Amino acid sequence: AAYMKYDAVAAGHCDFEAGHGVYDRAAETFRKEGIPFLAGNVVRTDNGKRYLQTGTIVKKNGVKVAILGYTNADNAALMDKSAYSGLEFKSLIPLVQEDVDAFRKKHKPQVVVVVAHTAIGKGEDNNAEKQGLDLLNSLKGVDFLVTAHDHSSKVIKRDSIVLVGCGKSGQYVGLGEIKLLVKGGKVVSRELDAKSVGIKYDNIDTAMEEAFENEFNAVKAFSNSKLGTVKKDMVSREF
């Protein structure tokens, strides 16, 4: 994240699935690097306080941008309870809108981005794992909604908000573009657009490849290590 110079990172369900030993360490590493690790819908069961940061404010070309991040609201159903001991995952509705309103009132951002590790869904309003369309259809005062979890690379445009699915495995990058007309410090008009950009593997960043060569080899060695022998037939078909 530091190498990529990310402005913020939102936690996914797999981060929590790995347990406190992993995501607590990740949060501390991000903190040392000055990168906000966001999951505003995770609260402690002992005192009701938020476990991770909800959002951050960054400046881009003189424009104040609010970035709010959330993990999947249905995490508890996706992993063993020991992985999230002492924590509770809140629904993104109406929480995200409440947070957006609070951020806009306190920080007065000119652009608002919500990053949520939730599937797009069908807008059925009753599926905690798939709240993307529910958010898109209800959020006010948000320019971009970035979704994940279902590996979709869809782009859905509305009059005042655009949903960008981030895809999977680094195969696609969601690119959002916004044009602002600012007068006297106030935005008088804005144009939103977005697209999903495919990554071409024949154009590899060799500098990054060299920078992470040791880490790549360590993971490769671990992944290829022998754990045991299976003597019975296995079926790879999904049920």
Q: Model-flagged regions — what are they?
A:
Residues 187, 201-239:
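Hard-cation-handling environments
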Residues 1-201:
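Acidic, metal/ion-coordinating pockets
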